[in-house]
Curated annotation (Swiss-Prot):
Broad class of the protein's primary localization: membrane
Gene name of the encoded protein: divIB
Job of this protein: Cell division protein that may be involved in stabilizing or promoting the assembly of the division complex.
Source organism (scientific name): Lactococcus lactis subsp. lactis (strain IL1403)
Domain POTRA: 153-224
Extracellular side: 153-392
Listed Basic and acidic residues bias regions: 14-32
Protein name: Cell division protein DivIB
Location(s), subcellular: Cell membrane
An example Gene Ontology CC term for this record: plasma membrane
Amino acid sequence: MSEKDNNLTPWQQKHLEYQKRKAEEAKKEKKANQPKKVHFSSPFLKSLPKTEKNFDDTRDEAESAELLEEGFETNNEETQSSEAPIENEKIIAQLEQLSQENEYEYEEEQIKRPSRFFSLFKGSAPLLKKMWPALAIVVLVFVGSLYLISPLSKISTFSVSGNANESSEQVALASGIQTSDSIFNILNNKEKIEATIEQKFPRISAVTINYHFPNRFEAIVKEHTNSVYVKRNDQTYLVLNNGYVITTPVDATKLEKLPVLQNFNDEEVKTFVNAYETLKPAIKSLMTNVTKTPTDATKDFIAIDMSDGNQVRVSLSQLADRLPYYPSVAKQVQAPQVVDMEAGIYTKPKAAYDAYLSQLSTSKSASISAQNAKKTDASSENTAQSTTTSSN
């Protein structure tokens, strides 16, 4: 048995043996149907006269015929034996092909064959189709009930991020959220919780509460930035970029590089901050000290000391409109200069401007004194006339 035969399955080997037996039976049947003797006519024999043929010649002819017949049969057997391996290989190839086809058909049958589970519901498709909506509702209610009574429906952690000045513990406490609260309750009151936190912490400008699966919440905090300082009664207070003044005094040794407003009330502080926050950082960084210098014409006139040595005088109500021109003006003058923006824009050396202000103040004081003297004289005359009239 060849190596290829050993690789056949038991069924293929039995089939091969059956094919071999059929081949041998066909061979025997073919041999049985053939004539036992084949007579060949020889040219040599034809050349001899028929009368000269004797018994010996007849015997020799018979023996020659038998030898030829045996040779013919031997050749046939050799031919059949040489063709046998070829036929076997063909049979093996056919068997392999047949086996592959059977396996393929078996796999297709297994795929097409419904499972036992689905066979249980055979014939109930119309009923299931009608009951499907009700079954879906029942399943959803069941799953929802399980979720509500499970720990997953309760908040597990609440974290705070983005806070620099307010502590996470204080923000969490102000939110009123506890670990035993329902997730749906927090989601329904999300905006209310955010507004509560913003109201309790003036430094916080916005709060966003985010939900993270499965039961975590995070409060993302955005704080107001520090804008300026305001000095009142020798105490310095921080002002946020929304104009809110922190009521706790700041240590004078720990001040940031921000402008300091001198004796501004809350309304004036908010007006200044609103305009200040619209300016470019390059201009804001130059401002150091701001004082109120009202005039008869401009009651909200202020003086802004700049770090380059100049001083800008402008009305508080026009700060956002006029101050952006300062950088171009500063390039054209040599400090220290006073840049007056009350009526138009003009510059004057600081010493000359201070002298002008001093002279203006003296003139104003003299005018006030003269007016007071006139009022005193008029009052004296009225008193004298009243005395004369009463004596008469």
